[in-house]
Regions:
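Bacterial N-terminal signal peptides
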Residues: 4-15
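N-terminal, active-site-proximal structural segment of metallo-dependent hydrolase catalytic domains
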Residues: 16-116, 127, 310, 330-334
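Metal-dependent phosphoester-hydrolase catalytic domains
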Residues: 16-26, 207-221, 227-334
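Active-site beta-strand/loop signature of hydrolases that rely on acidic residues for catalysis
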Residues: 36-41, 71-82, 89-112, 163, ...
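Second-shell loop/turn segments in exported
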Residues: 73-80, 92, 97-103, 150-151, ...
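Structured beta-strand-rich core segments of catalytic domains in phosphoester-bond hydrolases
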Residues: 100-181
């Protein structure tokens, strides 16, 4: 089934406050900078929709049959979010204070609006519950771009979603939100693990999008849950037989020149979302084209973490956002 992008306006605005940024790197935003971020919100579904889905959840090992909008029964049992849970997530979103947020694992605008009031949205409208897209601060010029359906490998996985900021001006900027195959966080893509082979099939699709933007001379960024520790993804792109082995080396080839990429987290200290986690590397990334990397505000990378006691009491998410600031384009047409 073909998927379409929708742009929806947020319905309400709430007052903001600026709590301290526990564990976050970077300081306050430089004047006029654009803050872009990415956040996987782990099965974020509006409460009224969650209850309906929970009543017909799919047990472990069972098939959903022809149903496309389903949630697993373990998700139904553990991830029902209260008003207080949504309020806490919205508070962290205000702390993030991003102009644009690439979103993953969000059912759609009804759920996203509870975390990002005062934003507008571009979302894929897949019948599945785990969609992805963007939240865009109200007032920032944008249009919803095309969907990168080939990234779903025939509907098996998730498509990419494109966003165009300042369309038709000298400041036009392309962003792509992605959520790649899990299960191959560190292994080389030519390892025998099935997940690595699936991820390897997504890489050429991603590289084609990157190269198309680079060839057109456009600044761009890819943001999202790569499910891979790109900062440790070193070595040659291909093995001796020509098989793909490194995602990062394959896409960061400077061919065309704008495809000389930078990871916003490079050189930054890794911080878990809360003390109960024991991960040791980023899998949520902001990948910048050469032109955008030159506009990165030094020291602006930040990771908004959760207050430890709140992380234990609330249904938040197993990911927390990362962000970086970009200096205003000199040729910007406001």
């Amino acid at each position: 089934m073909r998927l379409f992008l929708v742009c929806l306006a947020a319905l309400s605005v709430v007052a903001c406050h600026a709590p301290s940024s526990r564990g976050a790197e970077g300081g306050s935003r430089a004047g006029g900078a654009l803050r872009i971020a990415t956040w996987n919100l782990e099965w974020l579904v509006a409460p009224e929709d969650f209850l309906a889905l929970a009543r017909s959840c799919v047990p472990e090992g069972a098939s959903p049959g022809r149903r496309r909008r389903t949630i697993p029964c373990d998700v139904a049992a553990k991830l029902e979010r209260s008003t207080a849970d949504f309020d806490a997530l919205a508070r962290y979103a205000r702390e993030l204070d991003a102009d644009v947020v690439a979103l993953q694992e969000v059912d759609g605008p009804a759920a996203a609006r509870r975390v990002f009031p005062g934003y507008r949205f571009c979302f894929s409208t897949a019948p599945a519950v785990q969609n992805l897209g963007f939240a865009v601060r109200d007032g920032l010029p944008f249009r919803c771009g095309r969907e990168l359906a080939d990234l779903s490998l025939g509907g098996r996985l998730r498509s990419g979603v494109e966003l165009v900021l300042h369309p038709g001006t000298a400041a036009e900027l392309r962003l792509l939100s992605v959520h790649l195959k899990s299960g191959c966080g560190r292994r080389t893509l030519d390892s025998p693990r099935d997940a690595c082979g699936v991820l390897a099939r997504q890489v050429p699709v991603l590289e084609r999008w990157i190269d198309a933007q680079a060839a057109a001379g456009r600044p761009f960024a890819v943001l999202g849950d790569f499910n891979r520790e790109l900062l440790r993804d070193a070595g040659p792109a291909r093995n001796g037989s020509g098989g793909l082995r490194s995602l990062w080396s394959e896409i960061d080839d400077a061919d065309p020149p704008e495809a000389d990429l930078a990871n916003a987290a490079e050189g930054e200290r890794f911080v878990n979302c809360h003390p109960g986690q024991n991960f040791n590397g980023y899998i949520d990334h902001i990948v910048l084209s050469r032109g955008l990397a030159a506009r990165r505000v030094p020291g602006s990378f930040r990771r908004v973490t959760f207050e430890p006691r709140e992380a234990l009491r609330r249904n938040l998410t197993d990911h927390c956002p990362v962000a970086v600031d970009l200096a205003t384009h000199a040729g910007r047409d406001d």
